Amino acid sequence: MNPDVLYEDNHLLVVVKPRNMPIMADDSGDPDLQSGLKAWLKEKYDKPGNVFLGIVHRLDRPVGGVMVLAKTSKAASRLSAQIRDQETGKVYRAIVHGVLENTSGRLRDFLLKDDQTRNVSRVSQNTPGAKEALLDYEVMAHQPGMSMLRIRLQTGRPHQIRVQLAGLGHPIVGDARYGRNTEPGTSIALWCSIMEIDHPVTGARMRFVCDPPAIWPWSVFGSIRER
């Protein structure tokens, strides 16, 4: 693996997660981010034995973008606590079908995950096991039949953005699970563009940014960069 490293120190490793790569080893047997980065660190620093690299947040397999990993157990524990207490910030970009009625807004839903199918559904508030999902969005640009959104998560539920936008009637382009029919090989147009954390040791606020790749459908919108 030759990772795209955004930041590294003794406590953190921040990389750009490639699209269509699982973050951890799974039943598919496909190369995963954690294993690849462990091997890279082991070779880079000539480390004997096992390399610790903790996963503290998740990105769905088809989604790319900023990924923060912990190089020590202490850093992993502190970062996990930040995420649990909603002290981190995460911003995504998405391209959806259609033109939204409002240029900005907040979506509030209640979601329920089916552990057998791993699908997530919008349900009523009083459904047993339902969890509140909140996100804020703004429209960045339009193209014929598509809109680019900037999304800030207020909660971090599985498949949250994908399910909420589909429920709004504007599924993400390329989302084979919750969207419209997609051609084989089409990647989902969802990208984690910003991650904000407090450094687990110094406490300094840190902001990591990366823009989506210049491929379809992102390329249709030109070079719109993050602020």
Residue ranges of each PLM-predicted region?
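RNA pseudouridine synthases
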Residues: 1-227
